[in-house]
Amino acid sequence: MGRDTPVAPAGPDLGRPDARAVFVTQWYVPDRAAGTRLLDEVADAWRAADPPDGLLAFHAHLSTDGDTVLAYAQARDPDAYRPFVRSLRGAARAEPVEYRLRRGVVLASSARPPGCAVVATFDVDGAERQDRIIESVVGALDGAPADQHRGMLSAHFHTSTDGSRVLNYARWTSDEAHEAFLAGATRRATLRATGATPGVRPIGFKRYHLHHAIDLGRSRTGRDRSTS
């Protein structure tokens, strides 16, 4: 298919109440063209398969620097995901990190779909550190004037089931809004919050554009709302 531009849908419904588990998979690629091919391969594998009822939605992204593909899959039944992906072929079989949504913060609303998603991850020493770093970052956001994070629509914090990771999926109005945030005071406050928390090691962040969105519930009823 060769698509190299993001699609229009709003991305995953991060706060949907029936999503009991989230599975995140990353692939590292040499360049944007390879990333686009991999995106298409994995999304096509999901579309061609017969997903179990326990899976809800699949969203695939490419980083703006073109070196990372990220898939974000939501499941009603946490036990349904791994047997399904192991039945697929090629890159779609890759093992994910399993998360639970711990907290969501909505900072602004927009009539337009988000322009990008920024995914930040942290390596942490157990469940208590997971909760501590989430509270620290949320506190930094809550304490900042709105003009210091203009363009940030929401931040949704996920904790890995093995206690080793925290993932923040943040939605932004545009790449430019996120770039402005990186130069501002709130960004510095969040860095201080993460750096001052023992047992927490920031891994970094990537900015992504959405390329594929598959609503598995609609696919099963014959009303496929997938986009590519």
Which sequence ranges carry the predicted segments?
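Short S/T/G/P-rich N-terminal loop/turn motif that feeds into the first structured element of a domain
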Residues: M1-S228
